[in-house]
Amino acid sequence: MKRQKRDMYARAFKRGYLAGVSGKSKDSCPIEQAEVRQEWLNGWREGRTDQWEGMTGVSGIHKLANVTTA
């Protein structure tokens, strides 16, 4: 549990990625700290790119495993 709390940037990236893959707007970012918000947006951009390339559902499972371990 403590390890998750220490790495806020990786968690923000992961949550942003998941929001992007699910098609949510970047305006739905819940983070207010500038550095952490930027990581969320980076994850969101990568997630949106994967969504546009069709990496959702079963075809995106291999990519999702790499994102969620961070």
From Swiss-Prot:
Role this protein plays: During stationary phase, converts 70S ribosomes to an inactive dimeric form (100S ribosomes).
Record's keyword terms, sorted: Cytoplasm, Translation regulation
GO process terms (BP): regulation of translation
Name of protein: Ribosome modulation factor
Organism: Marinobacter adhaerens (strain DSM 23420 / HP15)
InterPro entries assigned: Ribosome_modulation_factor, RMF_sf
Entry's localization field: Cytoplasm
Keyword hit for Membrane: no
The family this protein is said to belong to: Belongs to the ribosome modulation factor family.
One Gene Ontology cellular component annotation held by this UniProt entry: cytoplasm
